[in-house]
Amino acid sequence: MIFTPEHEALRRTVRQFVTHEINPHVEEWEKAGRFPIHEIFRKAGELGLLGISKPEKFGGMGLDYSYSSVAAEEFGTIHCGGIPMSIGVQTDMCTPALARFGSDELREEFLRPAITGEQVGCIGVSEVGAGSDVAGLKTTARKDGDDYVINGSKMWITNSPSADFICLLANTSDDKPHINKSLIMVPMTTPGISLSSHLDKLGMRSSETAQVFFDNVRVPQRNRIGHEGAGFMMQMLQFQEERLFGAANMIKGLEYCIDSTIEYCKERKTFGNALIDNQVIHFRLAELQTEIECLRALVYQATEQYIKGQDVTRLASMAKLKAGRLGREVSDSCLQYWGGMGFMWDNPVARAYRDVRLVSIGGGADEIMLGIICKLMGILPGKKK
């Protein structure tokens, strides 16, 4: 992927924003289990960082996705996983379908304030019994006059405790699972919505997560994105941006793991020599850096195809699979070289070790990615190429 001066200017803007507005507070926010999301999003919105590839008509920059990929990569310089995940929910999970298929009225009501950072969004897909199995979700939105009446619940919803709206995937008919779902924009202040207490997660500690319940929640049918029954297809498209964001976002974070480990191993001496002089260690770090470059190349190739309008299902799935597995590999190896210090809760590599584990679970588990790749290779049993 060829970067222009405009790409590099955006890269500098994101990095300065992270350096001055986020990283000085990460330790505090990680301990608190939350960060001031409205404040940070408003500041990001003022810089245009929440609408890079969104339509100019609604306040976005109108740039192609290569710029969004650059921003996602630079958000990886945040010294925790929870905050970039919350940003990714706003930019690449709860708004792509709205931006692409939503009515002008819906985009004015929800997309514009999401781009400016005045409103925080969340995405409502996963349920207790339907995580990667999106077709199996049970939440319903039944017609009643000009409204939908929504009942059910959504689980592990990032940003939900502070969200102003949710982009909700629900069953709007009794038809077949892949054609009975719709995406509906629902204000979180709508009567009948309630939340669980904050979920206590292994990692991504600074992002807020809860279960969301819907008890006869009534919203106008005009809040539906696009045609009724097209929600599953839209969500599959939305997943592509989520997976590209997640993979791009991993690159700089993994490099930070390696860089901080190198610095520690230069200072730490055992048996009279610096740890970094141990061939096992410096060879392993070289291997891991090489793998990160492979991930970067895969992300860039997928992004190039995406901005050309090509189907990136295969490459986005591969990039997400590679990112999740490499994240575990890098953080585990680096933690080992920190020894007992790596086992301490506040150690940066220990935090990465906890945070990156979600990448192989959320947004489609590794096993789902493998199934997609196998299907496209023509080797998934019972499936034709």
For each predicted feature, which ranges?
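Alpha-helical interface subdomain recognition
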Residues: 1-81, 88, 101-106, 113-118, ...
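Short Ser/Thr-interspersed hydrophobic loop/turn segments at strand-loop and sheet-helix junctions
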Residues: 48, 71-76, 170, 186-191, ...
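Short Gly/Pro-enriched turn/cap motifs at secondary-structure boundaries
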Residues: 87-88, 114, 129-132, 156-159, ...
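Helix-loop "lid/cap" segments that line or gate small-molecule binding pockets
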Residues: 92-101
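A short, Trp-centered hydrophobic/proline-enriched beta-strand micro-motif
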Residues: 117-125, 169
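Flexible, small-/acidic-enriched active-site or ligand-binding loops
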Residues: 136, 189-220
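Short, surface-exposed charged micro-motifs
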Residues: 138-140
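A short core secondary-structure module
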Residues: 146-147, 151-195
